[in-house]
Amino acid sequence: GWRDWLNKGKEWLKKKGPGMVKAALAAATQ
């Protein structure tokens, strides 16, 4: 279900991309 997908996404972000998260947030706020 979508919860499983969301959890996988969270784990991926923890491993791959604090910087990517920051960049996405910066882009979203512009």
UniProtKB/Swiss-Prot annotation:
It is found in: Secreted. Keywords: Antibiotic, Antimicrobial, Fungicide, Secreted, Toxin. One of its GO terms (biological process) is defense response to fungus. Expressed by the venom gland. GO terms for cellular component: extracellular region. Its main location: secreted. Coiled coil: none annotated. Belongs to the ponericin-G family. This is U1-poneritoxin-Ni3a. It comes from Neoponera inversa (Ant).
